[in-house]
């Protein structure tokens, strides 16, 4: 009898019996032999854990309840869902949500109401956080705060002492002193006043506190880093490959303060391309188990905002010791790769090195040298030839990856320019060109080679994995594309090539970026894992993150594993695998937090910026259609806003959900995904980072202002 069937039989037996039964009584009643009793033990443990049975004086009794453990996910309407690992999310009604906060881990009883499952919370096992960012409200001589996150369904009471110091509308950070129950609301103590959003721009500070991002380093870390010598020991240089005479250089954004990677190139006697990718050897300075290492692991990543960066590593490491600054001796980890004229990897070598970068180029300077800018050629005469050789190799590698099916999403991103006070002064699409692509492709090659080497060496690795997309999401994508008039021939299996072709078919069309975005949205999220399932988007069997150890902790882990593999060190494979499993989960979670915080910051800055442009006209593309209107993304600055359906006064419009469009009842006029429209900005809700437009006209052809 299999486990599932046995579980049902046990529940059936215990629910019929009025008295509790011993284990042997259950086994005998079900006619189980000695071998099957082992399975029964596992089943009873499972049922006990789930709360379906309880043990009373050594006997099992059916409780008639299903008890689950999960994480609370709050929604704006005051309701929530319990996220149960390995199971479906279960609805939490508003009267239960008053007891919990978003992210709390709870034990709950599953019940049914009107034929649908919902939960009743038994106990909070772990609180998500104790510090909350909230807005002050005065009402009926009472003072309370409303959280500015998923916990907005709570009203948190403050002491009279706190209330006397505060003003209506101020944003504060508070510590929860008394958690809510069904009968009494939460209480809190103000620990920081961020200010009034009407008087100064505090959105980034709010986001940093909301996500509990670190703004300073523990004293132990500061002291530890201060003690690191700035000079590289001579014995360390001697044991490494000395490449200080090599012509290598860095290419980075204009505002970059830390340089993870440097590149060099030469031709072999056979006419092949020998590419050197030098990566900052952060793991030399950040030793495993140190206070600095623990703090870097906890953070996981550097958090980037338009007006600041919260670095994973202290400045002495990130911007000085580790950074591959020009004309300074630096410790590096080098991946040396030889490619033929078709982009095939013919040979590679990986080793610890000492290098000396000869120049610090920006992406725009690199591009200017490639296309032949006389002034820059005069400034960097020795970089022209290697850069043009790099461009040739990039095009070879790009062609090779295209043949393999690599998907190039290449979505435009908004660059927000802020002044000294953090106020947005300009927003425009960030331009990516051939210099960006050169570095991108070289880094992909190094990352792939490192992952391949670790697997061949028999060592575990923290892979960067990207699973194939969920079929339901793909089907939704294809339905939308069909609404755009694209004829889809569904294959037996969805491969990277299939999605690559979709994007290629829309190249040069007005809907190109929209289709790239919709295709990306259908993809699974990439994550970190010791279990190699390949990288679907890049169409690679082996991939890891190795090239950005100053700003990503996963890369430091890979560096350490690689060093052990190169030295032939013995490792406890199972113990290492367990660590990588835990680290992969933690770092994937931290990456999501970084992405969400950074995107939210951009949204707030966009809203702040558009407040100064109310009344102006723009051209945009419809990126989403819903029952209450449609969303428009502006071409000029990638700001997205809503055109409400009740502002479309020329007709009565109905939502055609399958076709993702609004249709006029009398005129038959249609607004669908991909349509270009002229709109006017009419309102901005800064607090919720929302922009509202009104339609001026639908553009039949792609026009410009």
Curated annotation (Swiss-Prot):
Its main location: cytoplasm. One of its GO terms (cellular component) is cytosol. One of its GO terms (biological process) is mRNA catabolic process. Residues 240-567 form the RNB domain. It is found in: Cytoplasm. The keyword Chaperone does not apply. Residues 615-696 form the S1 motif domain. It holds the Pfam family CSD2. Its EC number is 3.1.13.1. Keywords: Cytoplasm, Exonuclease, Hydrolase, Nuclease, RNA-binding. InterPro entries: CSD, CSD2, NA-bd_OB-fold, RNase_B_OB_dom, RNase_II/R, RNase_II/R_CS, RNase_II/RNase_R, RNase_R. GO terms for molecular function: exoribonuclease II activity; RNA binding. It catalyses: Exonucleolytic cleavage in the 3'- to 5'-direction to yield nucleoside 5'-phosphates. CDD domains: S1_like, S1_RNase_R. The keyword Lipoprotein does not apply. It is an enzyme of class 3 (hydrolase). It comes from the Bacteria. 3'-5' exoribonuclease that releases 5'-nucleoside monophosphates and is involved in maturation of structured RNAs. PANTHER family: DIS3-LIKE EXONUCLEASE 2 (PTHR23355:SF9), RIBONUCLEASE (PTHR23355). Belongs to the RNR ribonuclease family. RNase R subfamily. This is Ribonuclease R.
């Amino acid at each position: 009898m299999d486990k599932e069937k046995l579980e049902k039989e046990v529940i059936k037996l215990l629910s019929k019996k009025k008295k509790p039964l011993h284990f042997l009584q259950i086994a005998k009643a079900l006619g189980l032999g000695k071998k099957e009793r082992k399975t029964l033990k596992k089943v009873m443990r499972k049922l006990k854990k789930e709360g379906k049975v309880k043990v009373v004086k050594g006997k099992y009794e059916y409780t008639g309840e299903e008890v689950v453990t999960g994480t609370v996910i709050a929604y704006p309407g005051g309701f929530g869902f319990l996220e149960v690992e390995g199971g479906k999310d279960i609805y939490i009604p508003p009267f239960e949500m008053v007891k919990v906060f978003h992210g709390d881990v709870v034990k709950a009883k599953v019940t049914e109401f009107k034929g649908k499952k919902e939960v009743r919370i038994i106990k909070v096992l772990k609180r998500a956080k104790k510090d909350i960012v909230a807005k002050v409200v005065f009402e009926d001589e009472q003072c309370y705060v409303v959280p500015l996150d998923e916990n907005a369904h709570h009203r948190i009471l403050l002491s009279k002492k706190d209330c006397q110091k505060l003003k209506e509308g101020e944003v504060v950070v508070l510590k929860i002193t008394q958690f809510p129950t069904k009968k009494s609301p939460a209480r809190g103590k103000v620990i920081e006043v961020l200010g009034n959003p009407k008087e100064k721009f505090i959105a980034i500070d709010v986001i940093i506190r909301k996500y509990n991002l670190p703004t300073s380093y523990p004293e132990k870390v500061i002291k530890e880093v201060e003690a690191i010598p700035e000079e590289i020991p001579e014995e360390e240089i001697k044991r490494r490959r000395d490449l200080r005479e090599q012509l290598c250089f860095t290419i980075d954004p204009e505002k970059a303060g830390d340089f993870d990677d440097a590149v060099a190139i030469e031709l072999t006697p056979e006419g092949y391309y020998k590419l050197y990718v030098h990566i900052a050897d952060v793991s030399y300075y950040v030793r495993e188990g140190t206070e600095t290492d623990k703090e870097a692991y906890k953070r996981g990543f550097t958090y980037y905002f338009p007006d600041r960066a919260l670095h994973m590593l202290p400045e002495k490491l990130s911007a000085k010791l580790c950074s591959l600054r020009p004309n300074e001796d630096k410790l590096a980890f080098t991946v040396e790769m030889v490619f033929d004229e078709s982009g095939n990897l013919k040979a590679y070598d990986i080793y610890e090195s000492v290098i000396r970068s000869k120049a610090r180029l920006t992406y725009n300077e690199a591009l200017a040298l490639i296309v032949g800018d006389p002034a820059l050629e005069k400034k960097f005469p020795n970089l022209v030839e290697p850069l043009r050789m790099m461009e040739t190799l990039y095009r070879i590698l790009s062609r090779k990856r295209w043949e393999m099916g690599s998907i190039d999403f290449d979505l435009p991103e908004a660059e927000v320019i802020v002044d000294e006070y953090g106020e947005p002064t300009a927003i425009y699409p960030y331009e990516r060109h051939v210099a960006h692509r050169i570095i991108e492709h070289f880094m992909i090659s190094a990352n792939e080679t490192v992952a391949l080497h670790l697997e061949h060496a028999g060592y575990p690795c923290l892979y960067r994995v990207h699973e194939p997309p969920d079929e339901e999401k793909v089907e939704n994508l294809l339905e939308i594309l069909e609404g755009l008039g694209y004829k889809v021939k569904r294959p037996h299996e969805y491969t990277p090539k299939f999605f690559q072709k979709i994007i290629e078919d829309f190249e040069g069309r007005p809907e190109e970026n929209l289709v790239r975005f919709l295709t990306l949205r259908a993809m699974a999220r990439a994550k970190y894992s010791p279990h190699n399932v390949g990288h679907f988007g890049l169409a690679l069997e082996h991939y890891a993150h190795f090239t950005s150890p100053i700003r990503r902790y996963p890369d430091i882990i890979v560096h350490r594993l690689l060093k052990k593999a190169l030295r032939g060190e013995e490792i406890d494979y199972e113990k290492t695998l367990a660590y990588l499993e835990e680290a992969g989960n933690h770092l994937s979670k931290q990456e999501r937090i970084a992405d969400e915080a950074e995107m939210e910051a951009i949204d707030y800055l966009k809203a702040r910026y558009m407040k100064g442009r109310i009344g102006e006209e723009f051209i945009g593309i419809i990126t989403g259609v819903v029952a209450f209107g449609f969303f428009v993304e502006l071409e000029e600055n990638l700001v997205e806003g809503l055109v409400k359906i009740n502002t479309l006064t020329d007709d009565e419009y109905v939502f055609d959900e399958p076709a993702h469009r609004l249709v006029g009842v009398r005129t038959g006029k249609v607004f669908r995904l991909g349509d270009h429209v002229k709109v006017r900005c009419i309102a901005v809700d800064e607090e919720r980072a929302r922009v509202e437009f009104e339609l001026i006209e639908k553009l039949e052809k792609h026009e410009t202002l």
